[in-house]
C-alpha cells in the first residue's frame, strides 16, 4: 500500500497524460470500481473547451483513492497510459525541488511506467514523468520522491548505471535559474575559442600558428566538408582561460586575407539559442517601449488612400515618423499605421481623426496594440458575453437560425404560435455565427451550420419576414401581426424589445455587401459629397440626436437610437423592405450612420445598394427553384 495517503486527507487524485477525447463519464467508469467518487473534473481551455490533458478525481475515502493509485496507475484509456498521482494543492511542494531528481540519457523504450518501476525501490514516488514530444521520448525525465532521503538514495545507487544498455545520469533537479547561473559561471572560465569567417584556404597548421602565440593549445581544428574543403570556421582549445581570453581580445574583428574574422567563446547550440532568444526579446521590448503611445492604428480606409495621402491627413497633428497603408496584391487592405514622434501628438490625432470622414468613409483611429494585447482583450470580451448568456434562463432559439457554436449547450422551449422569438441581448452574437450576405449576395441556408439537424415541420415564413443569420447586429424592428397573414409589414419596435435585441458588446462592424457596394468608386459621375457636421439629427416626431448623445448612451442603446431614426426614413422609400434594409444598414459603423442621417443623398444611395443586393438574392433563389423543379429535385 502507498504510505503517503494520510498526508492527503482530501483523497484527490491528479490524472495526467489523458487523450483529448477522454470525458468525465469515461473517467467515472474507470475509477468507480475503486470506491465512491464525489466529483470528477477534466480541465479544459476556457475558450475552446478542449481538454488540457489532465483531470482531478475526488474520492469519498482516502483509502479508495490510494487503491486507485496503486492499481490503476499507467492503465490505458483510449490508447494512452494515464499517469496518476496525489493532487498537490500547495504549489510550494511542487516548486521547491525537495525530493525531485533529474534523469537523462534514457533509452527511447523507457516510458513512465518503466521509470516508475525502476525508481520505486528507493521510496514513495509522488510524481514520475518521461518528457516526450510527437516523436516519442526525448531521453530525459523526472522522479519526485516524497522525501529528500529517498531522492539521495536513488542518486547514489542509480547515477552511472546501465538502463537498457545505456549509461544514465541521475542528479538533483535544478531550476532554470540555477542552470543559467552555472552556465554563466562556466562561461567566465572558458578555454575553448570559436573562430569563423577566415576563408577556404585555412588548415589546422595555419590556424595553430596564428593562435599559438597566445599560449599552449590542447587542440586545433578547422571544420571541413566531405571533400576536405574548409567550411570557414574552426576551434582552438587552450590550456588556460587567460590565454583563451587574450586570444579573443586581440584577434576578434581583425582582418585576415581581406576578411574580418570573428573570435569568441565557443558555445553549445542550446547556449547560442538561449542568447539569441534573449537578445531578440530585448530588441522586441525596446521596440515596444519606443513606440508605446505614439503608434496609431487606422482602419476603414478608402481604397484610394495610399501612404502619401495617409501622411497628409495626419500631418497637421505633429511630426510623423512613418505612415503605412497595408497592401496585398497591390490593393489596399483597408487599414494602416501612423507613427508620431510624441505621445501628445498621437493622442491629439486620435481625438481629432477618429470618426472623421476621409474620402467616402469614416476612419477608426486608436492606439496600436500588440497581438497579445488584442487577444487578451477579445478573450475578456468573449468571457463576459458567455457569462451573461449563461445567466439568462430558458432562452428561445429561432428554428431558422444556425446552431450555436460547438460545445455550447442551450435549451430550447416551444414558441407560442404567431409569436416572434425573443433573444436575450448577449445571445444575439452567439446565435448568429455566419455572415448575413456573401460577396455575391447569397443567403446561407439556415441549417448549414447544424449537422444532422431535423428541419421544423412548421410552414416556412415568406422571404420578406425571414432574416438570414448575422454575426453582429440584430434586426431592430419587431414583426407586426396584421389581418392578412400572407403579408407582413415592418413597424417601429417597442423600446423594451429594441433594447433586448441589441448586443451587449459592440464588436468590429462587419460590412456584408459586395465590393462595389462597400467601397464606391471615385471615378463615378457624382463626386463624393462631404456634408458639413450638423449640431443634431432631426427626425420628425423624435428628439434630436447628436454625436455626444450617442456617445454617452450605453452600447446596447446606441443601435436602438439609430434604428428608430433610420426606420421611418427607409419606410418612406421602401415600405415592404424597411425592416430588412434597416437591419442591414445597422451593421455599418455608428459614425457613418450618423452621416447618412444628416445626408439624405448618402442614405438613399446606401438604401438603393441594399435593395439591389436583396433583389439579386431573390432572383438567384427563384432561378435555383426553377432548376430544381426542372430536374425533379424537391425544394425545402
Swiss-Prot record:
Sequence positions bearing Phosphothreonine: 319
Residues with the Dimethylated arginine modification: 493
GO molecular-function terms, A-Z: mRNA 3'-UTR binding; mRNA binding; poly(A) binding; poly(U) RNA binding; RNA binding; translation activator activity
Location of Asymmetric dimethylarginine modifications: 493
Coiled-coil regions listed in the entry: none
Subcellular localization: Cytoplasm; Cytoplasm, Stress granule; Nucleus; Cell projection, Lamellipodium
Listed InterPro entries: Nucleotide-bd_a/b_plait_sf, PABP-dom, PABP_1234, PABP_HYD_C, PABP_RRM1, RBD_domain_sf, RRM2_I_PABPs, RRM_dom
Transmembrane spans: none
Domain (PABC) ranges: 542-619
Region (CSDE1-binding): 166-289
Region ((Microbial infection) Binding to HRSV M2-1 protein): 541-636
Modification sites for Phosphoserine: 315
Tissues in which the protein is found: Ubiquitous.
The keyword Ligase is annotated on this UniProt entry: no
This protein's GO CC annotations: catalytic step 2 spliceosome; cell leading edge; cytoplasm; cytoplasmic ribonucleoprotein granule; cytoplasmic stress granule; cytosol; extracellular exosome; focal adhesion
Domains as described in the record: The RNA-binding domains RRM1 and RRM2 and the C-terminus (last 138 amino acids) regions interact with the PABPC1-interacting motif-1 (PAM1) and -2 (PAM2) of PAIP1, respectively.
Protein role: Binds the poly(A) tail of mRNA, including that of its own transcript, and regulates processes of mRNA metabolism such as pre-mRNA splicing and mRNA stability. Its function in translational initiation regulation can either be enhanced by PAIP1 or repressed by PAIP2. Can probably bind to cytoplasmic RNA sequences other than poly(A) in vivo. Binds to N6-methyladenosine (m6A)-containing mRNAs and contributes to MYC stability by binding to m6A-containing MYC mRNAs. Involved in translationally coupled mRNA turnover.
Family membership: Belongs to the polyadenylate-binding protein type-1 family.
Listed name of the protein: Polyadenylate-binding protein 1
Species this protein is from: Homo sapiens
Lineage: Eukaryota, Metazoa, Chordata, Craniata, Vertebrata
Gene behind this protein: PABPC1
Amino acid at each position: 500500500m502507498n504510505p503517503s495517503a494520510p498526508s492527503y486527507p482530501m483523497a484527490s487524485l491528479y490524472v495526467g497524460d489523458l487523450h483529448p477525447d477522454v470525458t468525465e463519464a469515461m473517467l467515472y467508469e474507470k475509477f468507480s470500481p475503486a470506491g465512491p467518487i464525489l466529483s470528477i473534473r477534466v480541465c479544459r481551455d476556457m475558450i475552446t473547451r478542449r481538454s488540457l490533458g489532465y483531470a482531478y478525481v475526488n474520492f469519498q475515502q482516502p483509502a479508495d483513492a490510494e487503491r486507485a493509485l496503486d492499481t490503476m496507475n499507467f492503465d490505458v484509456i483510449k490508447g494512452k497510459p494515464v499517469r496518476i498521482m496525489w493532487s498537490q494543492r500547495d504549489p510550494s511542494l511542487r516548486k521547491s525541488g525537495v525530493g525531485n531528481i533529474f534523469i537523462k540519457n534514457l533509452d527511447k523504450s523507457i516510458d513512465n511506467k518503466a521509470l516508475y518501476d525502476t525508481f520505486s525501490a528507493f521510496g514513495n514516488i509522488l510524481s514520475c514523468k518521461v518528457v516526450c514530444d510527437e516523436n516519442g521520448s526525448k531521453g530525459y525525465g523526472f522522479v519526485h520522491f516524497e522525501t529528500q532521503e529517498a531522492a539521495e538514495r536513488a542518486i547514489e545507487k542509480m547515477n552511472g548505471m546501465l538502463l537498457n544498455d545505456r549509461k544514465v545520469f541521475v542528479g538533483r533537479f535544478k531550476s532554470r535559474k540555477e542552470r543559467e547561473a552555472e552556465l554563466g559561471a562556466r562561461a567566465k572560465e572558458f578555454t575553448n575559442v570559436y573562430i569563423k569567417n577566415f576563408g577556404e584556404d585555412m588548415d589546422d597548421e595555419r590556424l595553430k600558428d596564428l593562435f599559438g602565440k597566445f599560449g599552449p593549445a590542447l587542440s586545433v581544428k578547422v571544420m571541413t566538408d566531405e571533400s576536405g574543403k574548409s567550411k570557414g570556421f574552426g576551434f582552438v582549445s587552450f590550456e588556460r582561460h587567460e590565454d583563451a581570453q587574450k586570444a579573443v581580445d586581440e584577434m576578434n574583428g581583425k582582418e585576415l586575407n581581406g576578411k574580418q574574422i570573428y573570435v569568441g567563446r565557443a558555445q553549445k547550440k542550446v547556449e547560442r539559442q538561449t542568447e539569441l532568444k534573449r537578445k531578440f526579446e530585448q530588441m522586441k521590448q525596446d521596440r515596444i517601449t519606443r513606440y508605446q503611445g505614439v503608434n496609431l492604428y487606422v482602419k476603414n480606409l478608402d481604397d484610394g488612400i495610399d501612404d502619401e495621402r495617409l501622411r497628409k491627413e495626419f500631418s497637421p497633428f505633429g511630426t510623423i515618423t512613418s505612415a503605412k497603408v497595408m497592401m496585398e496584391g497591390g490593393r489596399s487592405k483597408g487599414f494602416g499605421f501612423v507613427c508620431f514622434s510624441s505621445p501628445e501628438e498621437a493622442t491629439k490625432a486620435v481625438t481629432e481623426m477618429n470618426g472623421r470622414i476621409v474620402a467616402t468613409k469614416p476612419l477608426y483611429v486608436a492606439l496600436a496594440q500588440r497581438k497579445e494585447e488584442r487577444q487578451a482583450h477579445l478573450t475578456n470580451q468573449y468571457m463576459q458575453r458567455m457569462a451573461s448568456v449563461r445567466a439568462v434562463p430558458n432562452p428561445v432559439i429561432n428554428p431558422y437560425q444556425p446552431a450555436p457554436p460547438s460545445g455550447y449547450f442551450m435549451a430550447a422551449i416551444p414558441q407560442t404560435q404567431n409569436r416572434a422569438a425573443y433573444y436575450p441581448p448577449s445571445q444575439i452574437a452567439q446565435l448568429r455565427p455566419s455572415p448575413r450576405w456573401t460577396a455575391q449576395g447569397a443567403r446561407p441556408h439556415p441549417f448549414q451550420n447544424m449537422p444532422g439537424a431535423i428541419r421544423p415541420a412548421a410552414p416556412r415564413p415568406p422571404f420578406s419576414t425571414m432574416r438570414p443569420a448575422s454575426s453582429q447586429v440584430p434586426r431592430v424592428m419587431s414583426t407586426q401581426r396584421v389581418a392578412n397573414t400572407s403579408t407582413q409589414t415592418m413597424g417601429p419596435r417597442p423600446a423594451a424589445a429594441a433594447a433586448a435585441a441589441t448586443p451587449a458588446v459592440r464588436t468590429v462592424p462587419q460590412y456584408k455587401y459586395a465590393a462595389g457596394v462597400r467601397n464606391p468608386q471615385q471615378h463615378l459621375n457624382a463626386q463624393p459629397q462631404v456634408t458639413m457636421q450638423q449640431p443634431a439629427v432631426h427626425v420628425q416626431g423624435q428628439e434630436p440626436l447628436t454625436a455626444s448623445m450617442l456617445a454617452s448612451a450605453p452600447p446596447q442603446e446606441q443601435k436602438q437610437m439609430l434604428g428608430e431614426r433610420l426606420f421611418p426614413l427607409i419606410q418612406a422609400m421602401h415600405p415592404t423592405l424597411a425592416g430588412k434594409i434597416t437591419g442591414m444598414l445597422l451593421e455599418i459603423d455608428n459614425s457613418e450612420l450618423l452621416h447618412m442621417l444628416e445626408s439624405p443623398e448618402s442614405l438613399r444611395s446606401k438604401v438603393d445598394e441594399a435593395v439591389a443586393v436583396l433583389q439579386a438574392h431573390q432572383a438567384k433563389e427563384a432561378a435555383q427553384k426553377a432548376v430544381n423543379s426542372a430536374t425533379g429535385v424537391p425544394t425545402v
